[in-house]
């Protein structure tokens, strides 16, 4: 039975990572995230003419002490040129403490919208840097954080 669960989990992660709707890029936080520790996620845009939906992927466990998460997000282009900086708040749990998202065991994964129909200025390599904006210096309970980049399907009349 245990082998079936691991096989299912492995296939699920592969299918999510290879989704035709978008690509997911993750970085590890390892349950302790320092206030000044910028998590860097690098990716390449090959079709800048097509707008993209940018979605953050947050994986937290039961040690996470809050129901919300403040993120400071910076998109950087070639030569580390800052294209966009935002301060964002996401709700991770219901008022009763139940986590939003899905997952097996103590770890929950939630996808939260960042940018709709974002147009990158050119093809090339980009980076998203994420810092937490919570009041604590060492934030517990975040396992991984990442970004999903979805190509927007356009229909022609």
In which residue ranges do the predicted regions lie?
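C-terminal motif of bacterial Sec signal peptides marking the signal peptidase cleavage site
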Residues: 14-17
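Bacterial signal peptide processing site
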Residues: 19-22
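Post-signal peptide N-terminal segment of mature Sec-exported envelope proteins
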Residues: 26-47
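Post-signal-peptide N-terminal segment of Sec-exported extracytoplasmic proteins
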Residues: 40-68
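Short acidic/polar inter-strand loop motif in beta-rich domains
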Residues: 61-63, 108-119, 132-140
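Short coil-to-beta strand junction motifs in C2/discoidin
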Residues: 65-71, 141-144
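An anionic, turn-rich surface loop/hairpin at beta-sheet edges
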Residues: 88-119
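Internal, hydrophobic beta-strand segments that form the core of beta-sheet-rich folds
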Residues: 121-136, 141-151
């Amino acid at each position: 039975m245990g082998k079936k669960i691991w096989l299912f989990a492995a296939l699920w992660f592969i299918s999510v990572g290879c989704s035709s709707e978008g690509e997911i890029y993750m970085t590890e936080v390892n349950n302790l995230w320092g206030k000044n520790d910028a998590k860097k996620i690098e990716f390449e845009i090959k079709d800048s003419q097509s707008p993209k939906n940018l979605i953050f992927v947050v994986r937290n466990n039961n040690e996470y002490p809050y129901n919300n998460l403040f993120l400071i997000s910076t998109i950087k282009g070639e030569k580390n040129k800052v294209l966009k900086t935002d301060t964002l708040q996401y709700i991770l749990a219901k008022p009763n403490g139940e986590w939003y998202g899905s997952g097996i065991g103590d770890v929950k994964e939630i996808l939260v919208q960042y940018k709709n129909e974002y147009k990158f200025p050119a093809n090339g390599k980009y980076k998203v840097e994420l810092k937490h904006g919570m009041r604590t210096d060492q934030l517990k309970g975040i396992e991984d954080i990442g970004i999903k980049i979805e190509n927007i399907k356009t229909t022609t009349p």
